[in-house]
Amino acid sequence: FGNQQQLKSVADIVINHR
């Protein structure tokens, strides 16, 4: 399942954007 990795990437970007 590569969905978890994508979700982690999105979360990382969101955290970085904050």
Swiss-Prot record:
Keywords: Calcium, Carbohydrate metabolism, Glycosidase, Hydrolase, Metal-binding. The keyword NAD does not apply. Its EC number is 3.2.1.1. This is Alpha-amylase. Its cofactor is Ca(2+). It is an enzyme of class 3 (hydrolase). One of its GO terms (molecular function) is metal ion binding. It comes from the Eukaryota. It catalyses: Endohydrolysis of (1->4)-alpha-D-glucosidic linkages in polysaccharides containing three or more (1->4)-alpha-linked D-glucose units. Belongs to the glycosyl hydrolase 13 family. It comes from Capsicum annuum (Capsicum pepper). Monomer. Binds 3 Ca(2+) ions per subunit. Ca(2+) binds at residue 16.
